[in-house]
């Protein structure tokens, strides 16, 4: 499946606050993410708590041990809504 991507302002705000090393690691992981956001290397999984809050299925993908990107699907469009530590959805 070919995916389209869109990022919210909140995502870019959070991305800009990340240390340079995490930004670099995120860019590397996005190369995989853009091919398939559900690639097994990313450990993408549903987040029940956020899904209930947003009224749609919300997912998180692991960039590194304590860095996640939070997103949802809108048809074939992947909408990234935030990036940060695991605390984003705890």
Q: Where are the model-predicted features located?
A:
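Short helix-coil-helix linker/hinge
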Residues: 19-21
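A short, surface-exposed loop/turn module that caps and links secondary-structure elements
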Residues: 32-61
């Amino acid at each position: 499946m070919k995916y389209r991507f869109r990022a919210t302002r909140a995502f870019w705000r959070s991305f800009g606050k990340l240390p340079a090393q995490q930004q670099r690691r995120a860019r590397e992981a996005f190369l995989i993410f853009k091919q398939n956001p559900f690639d097994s290397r990313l450990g993408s999984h549903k987040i029940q708590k956020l899904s209930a809050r947003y009224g749609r299925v919300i997912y998180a993908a692991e960039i590194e041990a304590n860095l996640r990107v939070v997103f949802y699907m809108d048809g074939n469009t992947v909408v990234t809504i935030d990036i940060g530590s695991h605390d984003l959805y705890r």
